[in-house]
Every structure is written in structure tokens, then in C-alpha cells.
Amino acid sequence: MQIKRFGFLAFLLAFSFSWAANASNQHGDEHGHHEEQDEKSIKEQIAEVKEHHLKDSHSFHLWGDHASGTSVEFPLPIILWDEGELHFFMSSAFHHSENQTVESKGSYFRLYHSKIYKTDAEGTIHYDEEHHATNAKPIDFSITKTVFSTILVGILLLWLFGAVAKKYRKDPVPRGIAKFMEPLVILVRDDIAKPNIGEKDYKRFMPYLLTVFFFIWMANMIGQTPLGINITGNIAVTMGLALITFFLTQFSGRKDYWAHIFWMPGVPYLMRVILMPIEILGLFVKPFSLMIRLYANILAGHVVIMSIISLIFIFGNWFATGAFFGLTFFLSIIELLVAFLQAYIFTMLSALYFGSAVEVHDEHH
């Protein structure tokens, strides 16, 4: 029992330390060439580190700095479509030239502020009056950090559920990983699907509800690692999940569901006319709220923890280091709860929308 408790505490400490290690490593890279960037204050450097962590990128940055030539990173595939031609190379190619320009089939591309632009051989970037890049951009199908991480989570889910199914085929009594997964599956079924959708219809929605629950939870947990993966802190990911829920809801809608939207029964005719645009607007507000809720909560968690870690470097003393590290450890434990809670809430609301779409109303007039 003591070994299990120690393992659990070590697990929590590892997650907490991962944040501090990641932030201190990136800040250390900035500090290493501080003499070359005297014009930048420590707050400006910290802001750059935060932006680097929160934004998507074309590689996994591990440690080091591009400016000093010490950067170590895991490159990802760059896939571009430009003027009828497909261009393919690894993201590391951008950092092998002095101006970060890559030549492919007679065209030149440059990675600038996490976006790829067409340039000349010198990598010239043109700007407008507001200092925004005006170069043409190819159609980018690249495997970015978020895309790679999403695929990785999908593979892990396939392996996880495949292993559970294999164990159940051999022995109906849950053992090993199946023993861990069964309570979570029952949680989704008995606490989310059945109460919100109903005994009659819940089974056809269970595959999606289980998938979205475990995907969000696992993505959020991976976001606690020092790799800087922030899957559900990317609004494109949360929008995709919300749209799937939206389309499943609309395609599952029965006659009563559409009747309550376009011609609300049981109310005066004038009120029906007033309620119709409100109900139609509600169709799109629901997925929008799903998207923003998940995105904002996860993004805010990353920002808060990185901000607290940054205070260590701003104050620059041992007392601040101990105090803020302790606070970071506490907030990291809270983030583990938030990771699960956001998966639960998204799944719960999705089931609630499905239930409203398939519900049959007994109206008596």
C-alpha cells in the first residue's frame, strides 16, 4: 500500500516538475544568448516562451535555441501544394539554411512565425503598413505538432481498446488494463448516456461518447507532459469535436425535435413565430459553447501555470523558487482533475444534445 502511495505521489510530482522543467529549459535557452538580445526584457522573453508553447508548430522543440545553433528538435513532415505541384520535405530543412529558406522543385519556401510563405532564393519577406507578411502562401497539409499528437492519441486509443477487447474475449472477468477501463466505460454508460439519452436509444451513441471522452481525457493528460503538446488548447481541434457532435445531433433529430425548433407546440401562434429564430440560433450556439468551453479552460490552465513559473525568473531568488514551485505543484494536481472534468463535461453535454434530438414528446392539446 505504501509503495502504491509513493508511486502516486511520484506521478503527481513528475507532472508538476514537467511544467517547471519545460519552462526553465526554454527560458534557459533565452538566457543563454541574453547578451545578444539585450534590448529584450525578461518579461518579453517570457512572453515569447509562452507564445512558443501555446502555438502550434512544425516540429517538437526539445531544448536549445535556433539563434545559437544549439536547438534539438524532432522534425515533422512538411507537405505543401503550390501551383499544381506537391512539395514534401522535413521541417528540419528550414533550419539547415542561414535564412531558413528551403528550395523544392524550383520554388522557395520560408518558415516565418510558424507559417510557411513563398519567397525568393534569399528568403525575402515583404510587409504591409501594419508589418504583416504579404508573401503568397502555399496550401499547407503539413503534419504539425497538434496533428501528430492527435494521430498519436488515436493510435493509443485503438491499442488501448483493442487490448481491452482481447482480454474480454479470453476472460469475461476484467483483469489488468480492462480492470482499469471498465469503471470508466460504466461511468459513461450509466452516468452520462442512459440518463440523458434514454434506455431505448443510448446504445447507438455509446461508441462516439466513449471515443470523445477518452480522446479528450488522454489529450489533456498528454498536455501535462514537458513536450509542450496542447491539443485541446487548439481551437481547430475543439471546433472539429463540436462539429461532430452538432452533425450527429441534427442527423439523429426526430420529428418532435424539428417541430420544437420551427413550430413550437403548446404555445400561442405569435409566440411560435418569436421562438423560431431563437431556437434556430440555439442550434449553432450549442456547438459554439462546446468549442469555446473546452478550448478556453485548457488554454487558461496552461497560461496560468506558465505565468506562475515565469515569476520564478522575474523575482530571481530562492524563496520565490520554492514558493512558486510549490504553487505550481498544487495547480498541476488541479489540472489533472480539470483534464478529466473537461472530458466529462463535453461528453455529458453531447449526450444531452443527443437526448433532446431523439426524445419523443407526448403532447396533448
Segment roles from a protein language model:
Residues L158-N196, D256:
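Hydrophobic transmembrane alpha-helix segments characteristic of membrane transport
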Residues A133-P138, V188-D201:
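Cytosolic juxtamembrane amphipathic/interface segments immediately preceding
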Residues D191, F205-M206, T211-F214, M218-T225, ...:
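Hydrophobic alpha-helical transmembrane segments and adjacent short intramembrane/lumenal linkers
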Residues Q2-I3, W19-P174:
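Perimembrane topogenic segments of multi-pass inner/organellar membrane proteins
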Residues L9-S18:
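Bacterial N-terminal signal peptides
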Residues K4-A10, V147, I151, F205-L209, ...:
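Alpha-helical transmembrane segments
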Residues L152, L156, V185-R189, L210, ...:
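Membrane-embedded alpha-helical core segments of multi-pass
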Residues T225-I231:
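Membrane-interface helix caps and helix-loop-helix hairpins in membrane proteins
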